[in-house]
Structures are given as structure tokens and as C-alpha cells.
């Protein structure tokens, strides 16, 4: 950790709270951050710190390390807004919202009322066979080979297959979609990020306009029937929701899968627990969501407020640092241990009114991936000679993961 120069410190921020954290360096490191950087951070930082590099582009914001403090914020949409949180539109000089993620009440309530039934548990359960088949097709391509590039051959393709199926978008453009997604979510360069946002917007708007003219039974066509404030959704709202599905569906599960399968490859004996007691898979997924959560998201202070006695000014960013809060020793007993029978909750899929819209699908994807790998393959491990690297930043993941078995 490094102390930031005084020139970057607002007047209301005490010097002793200002830090620059390696956890948000947005680069590859050789040591697993869940075993090094995060426990060190929990042991040394106060409950609230002003981190100079916490937001993409090395922009500052407040880091909360406490689970309870973060949950209190998530339950308080009056004081902590999400309006424009990701700066996606602002990055390209526009003002649309990512829907429902960047909307606030009361319109957020109306958006979720229209969307929640479409992502309800029973709706997602109806996709189970389709999701399982997607997993099996990918696994069958490498299971007899004895090794795989897990990220390239499975974790990038599997959740994207499912989102593209849902939106009825062409599977043969997956590589291009992935390139755009990485340029948006894994760069520190705002020009690169903005160029990718423009490409995604241009593509999605073309699809939306075509579906508006020639509707089918796909999800995008159905969005036009959604109502808000007594009217149908407009094209900008339909786009804002499709953009939400694009950035959410193309990355979060991919990053989680890489983190999970890296852990199981480094500690193969933990696979044996799940093979011997497959009933643990459901709770194991929840524990992985706690221990290997990838995303640091944010809220924006809507007004002057205090957290732990520290003044927060309107417009300042406050973290929802799920990788960090999952290791809060004041909330979790022995947080450094991955325990498949742990029952404690987590906030890796959000909380409050902004609980993840796709959480039931995400859980199902993770559970099925584990079930199918454990069924199809013998015990896997990190491939001989392969050195795992970990990307630290706002979406923590393993960029490559070579596994072998047999």
C-alpha cells in the first residue's frame, strides 16, 4: 500500500485515510489475491479508506471493508444512488442509463416490476436442460484430450452461449463480442473503453431496430411489451437493458468460473469433497460466491452523509467491494477458509433493491458447470509447468487457466 500525494486529496479527507491499493492496480500478479492482498487489507486498513485508484482510470473513491457497513449502504437508495454509476454513457458523451442497474426509485421499481418475472426462479429453471447441454457440448470437445485451456475453451464460451441464446444473437460473432467486452471491462484506458461502448451500442441498436420492425419470440422482441409509467418502453430503455445483459452476462460468470476452477485445480482434494457429497454443490457455489467474488461495484453519494464518522460529499463514489467484504473477519468466522457447508450470506450478487436480476441464472450456470465437470472428468489439476496469474482490479479473474487430468 502507498500513501497518495496531498494534491489528490480533497479537503474533507484525512491524510491518514488516503491509500493507493495494489488490489486495484489493474494488472496481472503472481500471487492469489484472496490468499494475500485481501486478508492483508482486512488486517491493516480501517473500515473506511479513501483509495486513489479504486475506480477505472485510476480515479478515487471510498473503500468499505465491512460487510455490515456495505449492507447498510445497499439498503439505503435515498442516500446512495446508482444513477450513471458505471459512466458508460458519459464516457461517450451521452446520457442513457444501463437498465435496471443504473436506475433509481421510483422508476427503478417500475423497471424491476417488469423484469423480475422474466428472471424468476421458475423461468430460469425452464432453461436448465439447455444450459446443461451447452456445458456438455463444450466439455465433450476436450474431455478425452486430458487437458484444456479452461478460460478459452469453457468459461468464456459457456455463459456467453446462454446469453446469446436468450437474446437470439449470432453465436458465430462470439469472438468479436468478447473482444468488445474485454475492452470495456478489463482496461484502464478510457479511450479504449469508449470505443468499445460505441461498437456495442451500434450493434445492439441495429438489432433492436430490426426486432422492433420484425418482432419474434426472442427476449429482445419481448422487451418492447414492457410497461413503465403507463407506457411501453422506448428504444433507449430497451437498449439500456440489452446493454445491461451484455456486460453482465458476458463477464461475471466467466470470471467466477475461472476463480472457482483455479481454486479446485490448485487444491484437488477439495474436488473430492464434492464428488463424495454432490449435495454440497449448491452450498459450495454460495461459498465460492463469497470467497472468490470478482466484482467491485459502486454507489454514489446523493447528498452529504457520514459513514463511521467520516464525511462523504455528494458525487463521491463508495465501493461495493464484494471480494473484500467476503473476508470481513468481524462478520465471517475464519473467512480465509473455503468451507462448503458455510451458511453465512454474502453480497456477491448485490443487495437491497439492486439485487442481481440474473442471480438465479448465474447460480444455475455455476452449479451445472461443477456438476458436469465432476461427472465427465477425473480429478483435474493445474497443468504441469503452467504458472497461474491473477488479474487484480474491479473484476478479479484469471486471464488464462491450463488444466490437466488423467
Where are these regions (language model features)?
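Cytochrome P450
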Residues: 1-406
Amino acid at each position: 500500500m502507498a500513501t497518495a500525494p496531498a494534491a489528490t486529496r480533497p479537503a474533507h479527507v484525512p491524510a491518514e485515510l488516503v491509500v493507493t491499493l495494489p488490489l486495484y492496480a489493474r494488472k496481472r500478479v503472481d500471487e492469489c489475491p484472496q490468499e494475500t492482498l485481501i486478508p492483508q487489507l482486512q488486517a491493516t486498513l480501517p473500515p473506511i479508506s479513501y483509495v486513489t485508484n479504486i475506480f477505472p482510470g485510476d480515479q478515487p473513491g471510498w473503500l468499505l471493508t465491512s460487510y455490515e457497513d456495505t449492507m447498510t449502504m445497499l439498503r439505503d437508495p435515498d442516500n446512495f444512488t446508482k444513477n450513471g454509476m458505471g459512466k458508460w454513457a458519459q464516457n461517450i458523451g451521452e446520457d442513457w442509463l444501463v437498465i435496471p442497474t443504473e436506475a433509481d426509485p421510483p422508476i427503478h421499481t417500475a423497471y424491476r416490476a417488469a423484469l423480475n418475472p422474466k428472471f424468476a426462479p421458475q423461468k430460469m429453471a425452464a432453461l436448465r436442460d439447455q444450459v446443461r447441454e451447452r456445458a456438455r457440448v463444450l466439455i465433450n470437445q476436450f474431455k478425452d484430450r486430458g487437458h484444456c485451456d479452461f478460460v478459452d475453451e469453457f468459461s468464456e464460451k459457456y455463459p456467453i452461449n446462454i446469453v446469446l441464446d436468450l437474446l437470439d444473437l449470432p453465436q458465430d460473432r462470439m469472438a468479436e463480442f468478447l473482444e468488445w467486452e474485454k475492452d470495456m471491462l478489463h482496461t484502464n484506458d478510457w479511450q479504449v473503453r469508449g470505443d468499445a461502448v460505441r461498437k456495442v451500442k451500434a450493434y445492439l441498436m441495429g438489432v433492436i431496430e430490426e426486432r422492433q420492425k420484425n418482432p419474434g419470440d426472442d427476449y429482445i422482441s419481448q422487451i418492447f411489451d414492457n410497461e413503465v409509467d403507463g407506457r411501453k418502453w422506448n428504444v433507449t430503455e430497451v437498449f439500456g437493458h440489452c446493454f445491461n445483459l451484455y456486460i453482465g452476462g458476458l463477464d461475471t460468470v466467466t470470471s467466477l468460473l475461472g476463480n472457482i476452477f483455479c481454486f479446485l485445480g490448485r487444491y484437488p482434494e477439495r474436488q473430492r469433497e464434492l464428488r463424495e457429497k454432490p449435495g454440497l454443490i449448491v452450498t459450495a457455489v454460495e461459498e465460492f460466491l463469497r470467497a472468490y467474488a470478482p466484482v467491485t461495484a459502486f454507489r454514489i453519494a446523493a447528498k452529504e452523509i457520514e459513514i463511521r464518522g467520516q464525511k462523504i460529499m455528494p458525487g463521491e463514489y463508495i465501493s461495493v467491494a464484494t471480494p473484500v467484504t467476503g473476508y470481513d473477519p468481524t462478520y465471517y468466522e475464519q473467512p480465509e477458509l473455503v468451507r462448503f457447508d458455510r451458511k453465512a450470506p454474502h453480497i456477491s450478487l448485490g443487495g437491497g433493491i439492486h439485487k442481481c436480476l440474473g442471480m438465479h441464472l448465474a447460480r444455475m450456470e455455476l452449479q451445472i458447470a461443477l456438476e458436469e465437470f465432476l461427472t465427465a472428468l477425473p480429478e483435474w489439476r493445474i497443468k504441469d509447468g503452467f504458472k497461474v496469474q491473477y488479474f487484480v482490479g474491479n473484476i478479479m479473474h484469471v486471464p488464462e487457466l491450463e488444466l490437466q487430468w488423467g
